[in-house]
Amino acid sequence: MYTQISSFKINKVIFKTEKFNKNDELKIVQITDFHDNKRINKAKMMKEIKELNPDIIVLTGDIIDFKTEDFTNTISLMKGLLKINSHVYFVEGNHELRHKKGQEFLSYIKKIGINIIDNDCKKVIINGKHINICGVEFLLEKTDFEKAVSNIENDKYTILLSHSPNRPLIYVDSRVDLILSGHTHGGQVRLPVVGAIVAPGQGLFPKYDKGVYPLGNTTLYIDSGLGCSVQPIRFLNKVQFSYIIVKGER
């Protein structure tokens, strides 16, 4: 079980969109639920991410744990990511929200160049492609979602970052092309055929635990994360980050 929480894998996922021309693609690295994991070889992970050469890097919350006393390990991760690409976007998770020094942590990462986009949206141009990168806070309400997407250009590809996969679903509509989230840890402990036994916010045998979920014109993707909470245990569920490629087919 120790290797399940210390030796990471890269989960590659491909999505397609008619909002990009054929032969165009957007490369994304998603990191979620790191929980200040000191067991991971960060130098190796940075090397792997650099070789992937992502266009943007997204952090979908719980990068620290609510028990984290020293932010040094996580700040080192953040600085390493910024050296690879300055396009790093972040939304808070419940552990940042719960931490007694959570606001201090958020203020610092913003100061060093991390783009915090809780209830906000950034319009960016990546290699000629116009993209909306939006985010919502963990305890979102409809007004928060509307604030995040109110000024998007509907003909541009829109990514929504949300720590929780299930909380925004009652609000999300076709304005959003791709939702990237975490929070579930894939259940941490999984069983063959059954999948996740339990996930926060969903209880036993969750509907949304990890992977890809088509939702009409929107797609939800849940990364199972790089860390653990409560107990340092994973089973049939190795820690990971995701390499996401959005390919054009217009």
Language-model region placement:
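N-terminal membrane-anchoring alpha-helices
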Residues: 1-23
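Beta-strand-turn-beta hairpins that frame and shape the catalytic cleft
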Residues: 16-29, 114, 122-134, 154-156, ...
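Membrane-embedded segments
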Residues: 21-115
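Solvent-exposed loop/turn segments at secondary-structure junctions
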Residues: 63-66, 94-98, 122-124, 138-141, ...
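Binuclear metal-dependent hydrolase catalytic cores centered on His/Asp/Glu-rich metal-binding motifs
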Residues: 100, 106-107, 111-114, 121, ...
